[in-house]
UniProtKB/Swiss-Prot annotation:
Pathway: Protein biosynthesis; polypeptide chain elongation. GO terms for molecular function: translation elongation factor activity. SUPFAM superfamilies: Nucleic acid-binding proteins, Translation proteins SH3-like domain. Belongs to the elongation factor P family. It is found in: Cytoplasm. SMART domains: EFP, Elong-fact-P_C. This is Elongation factor P. Its main location: cytoplasm. Keywords: Cytoplasm, Elongation factor, Protein biosynthesis. One of its GO terms (cellular component) is cytoplasm. The gene is efp. CDD domains: S1_EF-P_repeat_1, S1_EF-P_repeat_2.
């Protein structure tokens, strides 16, 4: 159980048999009456967003989520198949469960799969990934002086803005949280 006073962005709670993540919260102390906490909750499974108000200090069941490190092995139709590298058990997640993470997910990548009651819910990507540029406009000598950017399509199909001097075939590091270019990867 967790007190509504202890809510923070990212806290997971159980309501009506579902897992909800707090995406916004505001402690309100009106001049008259008791204090309350106004929250915006997002359903982890469906992605629905609702606003809910809790009394200050109200105890709410906290959803205990388990994270396990799994490797993305292959695609089976629209399903993403992950394997536990110690027990070799396979776990399947649908494209809906993967959500926006699919644009950075490539075979062989290790990710955290979040489960609740032994049911996989979502995938947590690393903060940055290294991917190869598959398509972009060619760089012209002297482009670095202007400091501009151009769109580039990565090996997973994601589109990222990169500096003008980046060319096809180069490996770059991308921030998965805000889709930004972090730098060239030299290996």
């Amino acid at each position: 159980m967790i007190s509504s006073n202890d809510f923070r962005t990212g806290t997971t709670i159980e309501l009506d048999g579902a897992v909800w993540r707090v995406i916004e919260f505001l402690h309100v102390k009106p001049g008259k009456g008791s204090a309350f906490v106004r929250t915006k909750l997002k359903a982890v499974v469906s992605g629905n967003v609702v606003e809910k108000t809790f009394r200050a200090g109200e105890m709410v069941p906290q959803a205990l989520l388990e994270k396990s490190k799994l490797q993305h092995t292959y695609m089976d139709g629209d399903d993403f198949v992950f394997m536990d590298m110690t027990s070799y058990e396979e776990t399947r997640l649908t494209a809906k469960q993967i959500g926006e993470s699919r644009k950075y997910l490539k075979e062989g990548m290790e990710v955290n799969v979040v489960s609740w009651n032994e049911k996989p819910l979502e995938v947590e990507l690393p903060n940055s990934v290294v991917l190869e540029i598959k398509e972009t406009d060619p760089g012209v000598k002297g482009d670095t002086a202007s400091g501009g950017t151009k769109p580039a399509i990565l090996e997973t199909g994601a589109q990222v803005m990169v500096p003008l001097f980046i060319s096809i075939g180069e490996k770059i590091r991308v921030d998965t949280r805000n889709d930004s270019y972090l730098g060239r990867e030299t290996q």
